[in-house]
């Protein structure tokens, strides 16, 4: 039974929701702030705080857990990616790998003394197309 186990489903399947949160987490870590709707931000805050807690541990096990949570795959380059790498265009391939480095090196050390509450949600106005309330979720800068 699911008593007291509430998950914000956001009207998505489990796989869609996991991929969406992984992509939002990668964007949040790399940019340190993203604009989204309020329900998504409130659900994402839980995962973002968990990532910082892993980064503060800074162990091999914590890195592997973060890689699994962010769905980063270390597959060999496809022929198309190999051609792009020869031309010097490796940015798209390396973006996911840089996220782990920033998480553990920059954000983990920034929040080393803080015990929780690493994110802030700032509400904005309503979106024009569907009148959804938008907000900015960002990591604190202390």
From Swiss-Prot:
Gene3D superfamilies: Ribosomal protein L17 (3.90.1030.10)
Gene Ontology biological process terms, A to Z: translation
Keyword presence, Ribosomal protein: yes
Signal peptide: none
Gene Ontology cellular component terms for the protein in this record: cytosolic large ribosomal subunit
InterPro entries listed in its UniProt record: Ribosomal_bL17, Ribosomal_bL17_CS, Ribosomal_bL17_sf
Key words, A-Z: Ribonucleoprotein, Ribosomal protein
Pfam families (UniProt xref): Ribosomal_L17
SUPFAM superfamilies to which the protein is assigned, alphabetical: Prokaryotic ribosomal protein L17 (SSF64263)
Organism domain of life: Bacteria
Molecular function per GO: structural constituent of ribosome
Keyword flag Ribonucleoprotein: yes
Family listed: Belongs to the bacterial ribosomal protein bL17 family.
Subunit-structure text: Part of the 50S ribosomal subunit. Contacts protein L32.
HAMAP family recorded: Ribosomal_bL17
Designated name of the protein: Large ribosomal subunit protein bL17
Native species: Protochlamydia amoebophila (strain UWE25)
Gene: rplQ
């Amino acid at each position: 039974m699911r008593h007291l186990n509430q998950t914000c489903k956001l009207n998505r399947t489990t796989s869609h929701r996991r991929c969406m949160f992984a992509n939002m987490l990668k964007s949040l870590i790399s940019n340190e702030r993203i604009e989204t709707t309020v329900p998504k931000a409130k659900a994402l805050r839980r995962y973002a705080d968990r990532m910082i807690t892993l980064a503060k541990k800074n162990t091999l096990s914590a890195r592997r857990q973060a890689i699994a949570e962010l769905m980063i795959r270390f597959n060999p380059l496809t022929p198309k990616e190999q051609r792009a790498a020869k031309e010097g265009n490796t940015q798209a391939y390396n973006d996911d790998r840089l996220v782990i480095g920033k998480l553990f090196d920059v954000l983990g050390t920034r929040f080393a003394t803080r015990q929780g509450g690493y994110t802030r949600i700032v509400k904005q106005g309503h979106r024009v197309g569907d009148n959804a309330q938008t907000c900015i979720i960002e990591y604190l800068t202390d």
